[in-house]
Amino acid sequence: MWIQVRTMDGKETHTVNSLSRLTKVQELRKKIEELFHVEPQLQRLFYRGKQMEDGHTLFDYDVRLNDTIQLLVRQSLALPLSTKERDSELSDSDSGYGVGHSESDKSSTHGEGTADGDDKTVWEDTDLGLYKVNEYVDVRDNIFGAWFEAQVVQVQKKALSEEEPCSSSAIMAPEDDIMYHIKYDDYPEHGVDIVKAKNVRARARTVIPWEDLEVGQVVMANYNVDYPRKRGFWYDVEICRKRQTRTARELYGNVMLLNDSQLNNCRIIFVDEVLKIELPNERSPLIGSPSRRKSGPSCQYCKDDENKPCRKCACHICGGREAPEKQVLCDECDMAFHLYCLQPPLTCVPPEPEWYCPSCRTDSSEVVQAGEKLKKSKKKAKMASATSSSRRDWGKGMACVGRTTECTIVPANHFGPIPGVPVGTMWRFRVQVSESGVHRPHVAGIHGRSNDGAYSLVLAGGYEDDVDNGNFFTYTGSGGRDLSGNKRTAGQSSDQKLTNNNRALALNCHSPINEKGAEAEDWRQGKPVRVVRNMKGGKHSKYAPAEGNRYDGIYKVVKYWPEKGKSGFIVWRYLLRRDDTEPEPWTREGKDRTRQLGLTMQYPEGYLEALANKEKNRKRPAKALEQGPSSSKIGKSKRKSTGPATTSPRVSKKSKLEPYTLPLQQANLIKEDKGNAKLWDDVLSSLQDGPYQIFLSKVKEAFQCICCQELVFRPVTTVCQHNVCKDCLDRSFRAQVFSCPACRYDLDHSSPTRVNQPLQTILNQLFPGYGSGR
């Protein structure tokens, strides 16, 4: 296993080899010291937001193959200065002589004085102001920006200070110095609020007929910001569009909010309730009981029905509205809770400035602070490796490193070939086969479900009863072995049963399930099984690959039956026959196709570099022995003669790859897709010097939907030349988002979206069946 270690500034990166999942953090620090020349006590290691501490293993932090760990170098602690050195370094500013207050001190002192002056502002009652006591007005809220109905309770002005001259201009207080004490009509429980004069105006009471509404006119209308089709609050609206048909009237405007912000092109639903904005002193003050405007309920669930329990606007646990003074609000979800409804109940309102309910509160005991040890994981404590008394280092196997990527182009229960994986594709390790989606389990030989069927299997020669004849083979079921103690394999110790994966593989046979075995009436009608051959099967079969794992195509179950195996126990046998249009990879046609597609052995990222570094480190001691003073000519000749034999056979010289040529039909379809001509030019350039697999990866990257992050299915090419799945774009339109998901370009949602058929045809040919499950 190997990982990457990178400094925080990103300037230096090294690969650390020869690691295990059970490698301790303190052991990792020693390896890092050899590469970065940083002492272990000066190293701070970070992985996925956690600081790695000594005593834990890489498995505890879930560090996987080729992951990156960040290194932060601590500054070495300097020794304290002596008394003489410290006195000699003191300057005049340090000693405090001849220097007044600093700029920060001045600003802070000035700020305190200003605050005191504001707190000492004196307000007194006055008869001035545009609106008098008991007059009904409209008041703008500082949170929503909407206008609410209210009544003036008191009017105050800023009192004159002794320093201000008593002039006529001072006697006539400006409107900015007027403060109104108001009481909301719809919210009497809020009591009296104090608002500035700029947020108060005369009560709107005149309904503007539809015929008198004009574009550019500023009116007051009802609008719901969260739910545009429902009744909401009253806002100032600038009319931008007016349209009338035989059956409907449409009014659009810009809804004005706080701080000159606005919502553009909003449709006003209630066109018969548009009100005129009253100007100051335009009409007589409104003192009598006016008619009330209709506003939307503050709670969309209970519609402000006080007799109806509601867990949204009342107590979130019991739904009761009683005892509001004994309710506390959560600062995260804004839900109310009775003190006595909480578990455990509270005796009083918490004095903390911020309080969180049990659902929103973060358990501080689960938070790992910097420098703390990890919390014990219940999941890892139940693993066989945690309870085993064996000292074997199981963390070096490639089956333990975990997947770095996952196949999402088709679901896990997909029958048939994986799109983009041709017959003859080779991988060095089983974990890579899992990442490609051909066979997802890391260790198990059969991937399937007992109520659905088997999707894939690996022929690795693990059972002595297996017989491989290439186009057909006899496969032995799983089970009947004691794998306790985290074993990977063992001898047959009991009879196999037709359950779990054995039953799943039997379901692929085109015949009703039978506990005594069955044979397919038409074996080609059975469910397909992907077959992967492993190099371990070479001891029993000549069709196994020389290295790694190889995908050999689609097979189908002809029959299955129980019989006594070589071990003396009952085993389930399955006869599978090949049913694939692509040629077998061991035939001449298959080898030619493999060479044509440029299919080569795939290694994990960083594997060849790690192998080369390992060989390089192995040769260093040998070279030191050659250059030693005690070495003789005979010794040198022996060392030189054995040198070539020590080189790894795995690092082989790459053969020259033939450039892949697209079929004529696909080339013509690419020419038809003129909207993506630039993308296709970049993708086709990879065919010149890269294998077919790189070409497919380029296609996936170029035509990935930005919404679902998958290869586009039923693609829609927008006018801004971006490709999105039709379902994703329709979902965006239903959410009233009419812009391109990639660049926010405004799209025409009035016309139906059209699928790019040439692009869809190409993708179906390159990735057949990739639309399964979508």
From Swiss-Prot:
Where it sits in the cell: the answer is: Nucleus
EC main class here is transferase
GO BP term, pick one: heterochromatin formation
GO MF: cis-regulatory region sequence-specific DNA binding; hemi-methylated DNA-binding; histone binding; histone H3 ubiquitin ligase activity; histone H3K9me2/3 reader activity; identical protein binding; methyl-CpG binding; methylated histone binding
Region Required for formation of a 5-methylcytosine-binding pocket, as annotated, extends over 463-466, 475-478
Mind telling me which Pfam families this protein's record contains?
Answer: PHD (PF00628), SAD_SRA (PF02182), TTD (PF12148), ubiquitin (PF00240)
Zinc finger (RING-type) boundaries: 705-744
Modification N6-acetyllysine, positions: K396, K542
Which residues does the annotated region (Histone H3R2me0 binding) include? 330-334, 350-352
What is the recorded function of this protein according to its Swiss-Prot or TrEMBL entry?
Multidomain protein that acts as a key epigenetic regulator by bridging DNA methylation and chromatin modification. Specifically recognizes and binds hemimethylated DNA at replication forks via its YDG domain and recruits DNMT1 methyltransferase to ensure faithful propagation of the DNA methylation patterns through DNA replication.
Q: What is this protein called?
A: E3 ubiquitin-protein ligase UHRF1
Q: Which organism is it from?
A: Rattus norvegicus
Q: Which gene encodes it?
A: Uhrf1
